[in-house]
A protein has these predicted regions:
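Structured C-terminal helix/loop/strand segments within mature extracytoplasmic catalytic/sensor domains
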Residues: 2-121
């Protein structure tokens, strides 16, 4: 990668790690999961269930897109991936909130569970 791009990217990641609350806002997966990992990983979701993650300590970047555009699936997959990589504790409440994720209908009934299919990771 050209040095022309390296410094702006590094600056953006550093700003995201320092100001977690300004990335997405309270209650959003980006903010909650970055807090859960103490800012070691920078995350950002975009439109139609696009998610990116940057793990500077490992020099690793991830990008994913969920075809149907549903953020529930992208959040669950991202939590599964980050726990497999060892950067997110699966027992953390913010991870547990998203995987496995009970699906509650408007009457408050549990109608199922969102989980990763066997062999996905």
């Amino acid at each position: 990668m050209s040095w022309m791009y390296v410094m702006p990217c590094a600056n953006a990641v550093a700003a995201m790690r320092k100001h977690l609350d300004l990335v997405a806002g309270e209650g959003r997966a980006c903010t909650e999961l970055m807090r859960a990992m103490d800012g070691r990983v920078s995350l950002k979701t975009g439109a139609e269930a696009v998610f990116v993650a940057m793990i500077p300590d490992r020099k690793l970047g991830l990008a994913m897109k969920i075809e149907d555009g549903n953020s529930r699936a992208s959040e669950a997959f991202l939590v599964g991936l980050l726990t497999q990589l060892g950067v997110l504790d699966a027992a953390h409440p913010m991870a547990q909130k998203r995987l496995p994720a009970p699906q509650i209908n408007w009457r408050g009934y549990n109608t199922g569970e969102l989980r990763l299919a066997d062999g996905v990771l």
